[in-house]
């Protein structure tokens, strides 16, 4: 590994995404080639037991792009996928994003650099802070998201507002310490990780993003 570069895993948890996965991976590869030149990056598709053509599509792409990797899990759960892949990683930074790339990728380097430069241990995209832009989300879903934010902040006395945006970066050191204490294997994984991080004095930093439903 070239010591002049910071190694980075970009994990994409998926389940039956044959309709969108090829275009999303191609877009992410193109972006990373152009804008992540200071990182030794690889994309890891964490497949939670897809029964469609997702595996075949990713395997085809992995033969085309050396930085695209396929990881199969038979059990479902986004949290399980992330924890398994992050645990097996030896990269300096680890991240994940939703396969639909609903968060504008131009914000990704800002999150990466903030963790790389040690201004925080976990950087997260947020749809609920000032300057964020959310396009196409229904009023009902927006209301539910804000209610959930109010609920966990009130219950756990944490400062971050958006735990569920699929756009996060974590340092190797923080992951090694925190992951053994994270038990949820599904959608609550993100919230649990961030709560435990703040309670153990790891800095979580939110960044406004452009998010399209």
Predicted regions and their residues:
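Conserved donor nucleotide-binding strand/loop of the catalytic core
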Residues: 41-44, 55-88
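Acidic helix N-cap motif at the loop->helix transition within catalytic regions
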Residues: 19-23, 52-61
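A conserved acidic beta->alpha catalytic loop
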Residues: 47-55, 101
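Catalytic donor-sugar/metal-binding loop of nucleotide-sugar-dependent glycosyltransferases
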Residues: 158-159, 183-185, 194-212
């Amino acid at each position: 590994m070239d010591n002049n570069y910071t190694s980075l895993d970009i994990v994409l948890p998926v389940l039956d995404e044959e309709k969108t996965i090829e275009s999303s991976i191609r877009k992410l590869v193109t972006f990373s080639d152009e804008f992540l030149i200071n990182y030794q990056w690889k994309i890891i598709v964490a497949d939670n037991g897809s029964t469609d053509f997702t595996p075949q599509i990713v395997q085809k792409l992995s033969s085309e792009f050396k930085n695209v990797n396929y990881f199969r899990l038979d059990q479902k759960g986004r949290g399980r996928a992330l924890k398994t892949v992050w645990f097996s990683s030896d990269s300096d930074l680890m991240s994940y994003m939703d396969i639909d790339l609903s968060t504008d990728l131009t914000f990704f380097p800002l999150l990466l650099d903030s963790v790389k430069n040690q201004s925080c241990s976990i950087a997260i995209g947020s749809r609920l802070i000032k300057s964020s832009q959310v396009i196409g989300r229904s009023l009902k879903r927006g209301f539910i998201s804000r209610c959930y934010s109010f609920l966990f902040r009130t219950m756990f006395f944490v400062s971050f507002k958006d735990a569920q945006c699929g756009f996060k970066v974590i340092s190797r050191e923080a992951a090694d310490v925190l992951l053994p204490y994270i038990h949820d294997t599904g959608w609550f994984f993100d919230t649990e990780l961030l709560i435990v991080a703040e309670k153990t004095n790891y800095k979580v930093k939110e960044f406004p993003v452009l998010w399209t439903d």
